[in-house]
Amino acid sequence: MQVIEFIAAQAASLAATRRKIHAHPELGFEEIRTADLVAQKLTEWGIPVHRGLGGTGVVGIVKNGSSQRAIGLRADMDALPMQEFNTFAHASQHDGKMHACGHDGHVAMLLAAAQYLAQHRNFDGTVVLIFQPAEESGGGAREMLRDGLLEKFPMQAVFGMHNWPGLPVGSFAASPGPVMASSNE
């Protein structure tokens, strides 16, 4: 099965997961419910789970073949400290907290990749699935690194992604070098 077909077949489940996360936003270093959901899904798909890096961070490991090569795929999990005024069914149920930057979608997208990789394993190497806390307030990546992320899970490259509402559906954008990264840390 092709990736697009697989994702399309999982669309309803992925949307439900994103909506569940959206309805229960958690601020930086408070992503306990989200981390529990991520760990439960990864475990369900047979992916070994490592918790506690950076406080509430979650790491899943998908291996196949004999290569020592490894890449990381990263999604941020935290919400923003702002009130949601949307009225749809999955609007925030927590006053003063909202997934306004799309991290609920980022988690759902990385979970989709995790599920596909776990079920198809058509690669040679290791994929480290990094669910990072506290991106908005800062410090989540730093704390995961302090807790030994790169020592425990050596990787040749780490890829993060971010939704971009102005980009047409089905489009993909890339740029050489860092994008949307803080230049002062």
Q: Predicted regions span which residues?
A:
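Acidic/His- and Gly-rich active-site-bordering loop/insert found
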Residues: 1-99, 108-111, 115-116, 120-123
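Histidine/acidic-residue-rich, glycine-tolerant segments that coordinate divalent metal ions
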Residues: 58-59, 80-82, 86-98, 105, ...
